[in-house]
């Protein structure tokens, strides 16, 4: 059986213009066949259908939605443990005013505390309708907002550190919409190898259908400013048991295993956060 598997590898590599086989290639091919038992030959066929064409456009142009000009900002605030309750109360008193004020072209998408992952952490997701001009308009107005400046001064005493990123949403994900609760949310963050964002998007565009039956898919984003080649997938579940059952169900669907097989090599690092919504969060 081994020589036959090796000859397949040689043929495939000649067609693709790659180098000759190595010992690890034979093991990888065998693992791929075992990985998709119910789909004989899928490993060989996938060598041809998953090739990504070279592009001249930026991946932000190719992967983001054309019909909207939304820009997103995600904030991670690491709070001093003794101040977490006070931080939440202060946040819930001030941020909704910006969300409801039509003079500010920004809106809250979601606000959470991290439950499992980094402790004593708050995560905020904002939407700027109108892209970078809306972001700058909002930032300029906040410089003259006395209440917001006081909020920032008070908040700074409660924080250990903070960071943010500007994001675009993938074209094949639905735009995040308010949800009734109670739900828990999972933010899965993937740090990709440079140059692999388009391949990631191509694979997930085919695979997202396997993760929508229970309405668990909330939003998918990729970074534009801040740490680059970072992807965030946001999911909603009723509870941890529901999360377990939903994720296991995906593995029983033909095609999901191939998506995992082809996207795992693109990842340098991945992280999962389980988050609980704050009272003000539109995503409950």
UniProtKB/Swiss-Prot annotation:
Gene Ontology terms describing biological process: mitophagy; sensory perception of pain
Phosphoserine: residues bearing it: 129
This protein's name: Protein NipSnap homolog 1
Subunit structure: Interacts with CALCOCO2/NDP52, NBR1, SQSTM1/p62, TAX1BP1 and WDFY3/ALFY. Interacts with ATG8 family proteins (MAP1LC3A, MAP1LC3B, MAP1LC3C, GABARAP, GABARAPL1 and GABARAPL2).
Positions of modified residues (N6-succinyllysine): 146, 193
Transit peptide listed as a keyword: yes
Short sequence motif SIFI-degron: positions: 2-15
GO molecular function: protein-macromolecule adaptor activity
Species: Homo sapiens
Tissues of expression: Ubiquitous. Highest expression in liver.
Main function: Protein involved in mitophagy by facilitating recruitment of the autophagy machinery required for clearance of damaged mitochondria. Accumulates on the mitochondria surface in response to mitochondrial depolarization and acts as a 'eat me' signal by recruiting proteins involved in selective autophagy, such as autophagy receptors (CALCOCO2/NDP52, NBR1, SQSTM1/p62, TAX1BP1 and WDFY3/ALFY) and ATG8 family proteins (MAP1LC3A, MAP1LC3B, MAP1LC3C, GABARAP, GABARAPL1 and GABARAPL2).
Mod. after translation: In response to mitochondrial stress, the precursor protein is ubiquitinated by the SIFI complex in the cytoplasm before mitochondrial import, leading to its degradation. Within the SIFI complex, UBR4 initiates ubiquitin chain that are further elongated or branched by KCMF1.
Pfam families documented for this protein: NIPSNAP
UniProt KW keywords: Acetylation, Autophagy, Mitochondrion, Phosphoprotein, Transit peptide, Ubl conjugation
Subcellular location: Mitochondrion matrix
Transit peptide (first-last residue): 1-35
């Amino acid at each position: 059986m081994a020589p036959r598997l090796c000859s397949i590898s040689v043929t495939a590599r000649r067609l693709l213009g790659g180098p000759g086989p190595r010992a690890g290639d034979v093991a990888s091919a065998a693992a791929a066949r075992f990985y998709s038992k119910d789909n004989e030959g899928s490993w060989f066929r996938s060598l041809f259908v998953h090739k990504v064409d070279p592009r001249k456009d930026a991946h932000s142009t190719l992967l983001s939605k054309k019909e909207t000009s939304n820009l997103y900002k995600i904030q991670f605030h690491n709070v001093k443990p003794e101040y977490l309750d006070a931080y939440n109360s202060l946040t819930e008193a001030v941020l909704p005013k910006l969300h409801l004020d039509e003079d500010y072209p920004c809106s809250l998408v979601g606000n959470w505390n991290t439950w499992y992952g980094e402790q004593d952490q708050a995560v905020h997701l904002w939407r700027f309708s109108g892209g970078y001009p809306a972001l700058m308009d909002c930032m300029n107005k906040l410089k003259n907002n006395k209440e917001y400046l006081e909020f920032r001064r008070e908040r700074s005493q409660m924080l250990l550190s903070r960071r943010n990123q500007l994001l675009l949403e993938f074209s094949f994900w639905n735009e995040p919409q308010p949800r009734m609760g109670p739900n828990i949310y999972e933010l899965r963050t993937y740090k990709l190898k440079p140059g692999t964002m388009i391949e990631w998007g191509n694979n997930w565009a085919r695979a997202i259908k396997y993760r929508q039956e229970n309405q668990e898919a909330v939003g998918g984003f990729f970074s534009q400013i801040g740490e680059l080649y970072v992807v965030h997938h946001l999911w909603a579940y009723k509870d941890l048991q529901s999360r377990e059952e939903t994720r296991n169900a995906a593995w029983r669907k033909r095609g999901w295993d191939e998506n995992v097989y082809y996207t795992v090599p693109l990842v340098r690092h991945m992280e999962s956060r389980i988050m609980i919504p704050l009272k003000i969060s539109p995503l409950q």
